[in-house]
């Protein structure tokens, strides 16, 4: 990923790295914030790819396999019972494949951010363990 300005670097690299690092904390709060972070990272990556006209990350056999699986999910939702909720869930599963490719692109740019992600996971586990001990001894939940 090549950036022309610091503003572009912030929106297409720093902000997604920040969101990715906060996903463990978002998972504690529930599914909304983590799904929002995944969707934002995927959307920003798609905007970057269309802006730079760089689709080389999508020319990958794993992404093609994921697309085949995604089409299978959609066809399965249509054939089985044509439930609109099932079709909606299957249709928006493509964001996970784009999210994985976005993380690979971020790792290609600079792989030091994975260290911050592991620090966030460590802090998250530490907070959960301390909350578990507090809940065991006092009887009330902090989180």
What are the roles of these predicted feature ranges?
Residues 1-84, 105, 111-115, 119-122:
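Transmembrane signal-anchor hairpin modules in multi-pass inner-membrane enzymes, especially those
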Residues 95, 118-131:
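Transmembrane alpha-helices of multi-pass, membrane-embedded glycan-processing enzymes
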Residues 34-45, 88-101, 135:
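Hydrophobic core segments of transmembrane alpha-helices in multi-pass, intramembrane catalytic enzymes
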Residues 68-70, 98-100, 123-127:
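Small-residue-rich segments of transmembrane alpha-helices in multi-pass membrane proteins
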Residues 77, 127-143:
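Membrane-interfacial helix-loop-helix modules of multi-pass inner-membrane proteins that assemble, modify
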Residues 81, 85, 91, 140-141:
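Membrane-interface amphipathic/re-entrant loop segments adjacent to transmembrane helices
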């Amino acid at each position: 990923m090549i950036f022309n300005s610091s503003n572009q670097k912030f929106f297409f690299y720093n902000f997604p790295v920040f969101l990715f690092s906060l996903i463990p904390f978002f998972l504690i709060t529930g599914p909304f914030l983590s799904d929002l972070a995944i969707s934002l990272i995927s959307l920003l990556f798609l905007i970057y790819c269309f802006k730079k006209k760089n689709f080389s990350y999508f020319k990958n056999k794993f992404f093609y396999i994921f697309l085949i699986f995604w089409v299978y999910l959609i066809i399965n939702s249509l054939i089985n019972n044509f439930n609109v909720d099932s079709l909606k869930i299957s249709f928006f599963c493509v964001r996970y494949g784009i999210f994985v490719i976005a993380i690979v692109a971020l790792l290609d740019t600079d792989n030091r951010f994975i260290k911050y992600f592991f620090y966030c996971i460590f802090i998250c586990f530490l907070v959960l363990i301390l909350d578990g001990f507090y809940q065991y001894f006092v009887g009330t939940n902090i989180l």
